[in-house]
Amino acid sequence: MLFFALLLKVTWILAADGGHHWTYEGPHGQDHWPTSYPECGGDAQSPINIQTDSVIFDPDLPAVQPHGYDQLGTEPLDLHNNGHTVQLSLPPTLHLGGLPRKYTAAQLHLHWGQRGSLEGSEHQINSEATAAELHVVHYDSQSYSSLSEAAQKPQGLAVLGILIEVGETENPAYDHILSRLHEIRYKDQKTSVPPFSVRELFPQQLEQFFRYNGSLTTPPCYQSVLWTVFNRRAQISMGQLEKLQETLSSTEEDPSEPLVQNYRVPQPLNQRTIFASFIQAGPLYTTGEMLGLGVGILAGCLCLLLAVYFIAQKIRKKRLGNRKSVVFTSARATTEA
């Protein structure tokens, strides 16, 4: 009963409309959130664009330690279409180490883009978005008795952000969720998922991450989140992404409204500091920047080759001229003799 009550509070705070109707676009879209939810206009909002040349390396940042995430558990997990995202409940036996306090898991959910789009993540790294993003939500159970109490306190929540890109093969871990989406096609529908290792949803290596203070990315946008965004990415197949983009509806019945593009745009950093657990090996370039760099290098090489060619031609002509002069002088000397 206690867990069910906790789940309701999680749903109310992190996914429900709190008494107001909100969407990602249109008259109730994210540009208008601050009207009904003042904290959405705050100066410590999430998500953000992480510029790696501006982050601060902190050697004292301990590694994130997910406890219990690799255990299968005994109880099925609730999967819910709340009209804004697909949300999976997590048992309180899951918690994080490596943070200032004990943070207990509550739920996870996904953000993605339009059908056919490869840009649907909320956080960006060097202005580059990925196909989707997984958020794993925790609350400070050491200091507060409930998630609803912790949600309005500084660093009351801790959220793990996992960027998801498209790879060549399917990811079996994500199929635990994606294979059930047809059962919750419409808003407010729920189903059960057999217990599985939640850790398999994460990237294999968790040592490299970014850390900053931010907010919930949906109303009421409480500025109470200690964010950890992993540098390594998880991968799903194109078919799995299409299933995520094409299955769900944000409405309760037909005519249905596709549940797509459920991500908030990056918010101003406003002098906040982003810490990194690792030293950047070098500048990280976006695809466009890499393409521009490649074109620039090719153009430079072409100019260099042309310059060498013209210099060689000039030297060759000069040598030919000198040779003719020598021949002419020799012939003249012979005649005079």
Curated annotation (Swiss-Prot):
Entry keyword annotation includes Phosphoprotein: yes
Compartment(s) where it occurs, according to its Swiss-Prot or TrEMBL record: Membrane
Regulation of its function: Inhibited by acetazolamide.
Enzyme Commission number(s) from the entry: 4.2.1.1
Record-level GO BP terms: carbon dioxide transport; regulation of pH
Entry membrane topology: Single-pass type I membrane protein
Ranges of the Extracellular topological domain: 16-290
Residues where Phosphoserine is found: S325
Chain residues that bind Zn(2+): H109, H111, H135
Statement: the UniProt record of this protein carries the keyword NADP: no
Entry binding sites for substrate: T217, T218
Family matches, as CDD domains: alpha_CA_XII_XIV
Matches recorded under PANTHER family: CARBONIC ANHYDRASE, CARBONIC ANHYDRASE 14
Entry protein name: Carbonic anhydrase 14
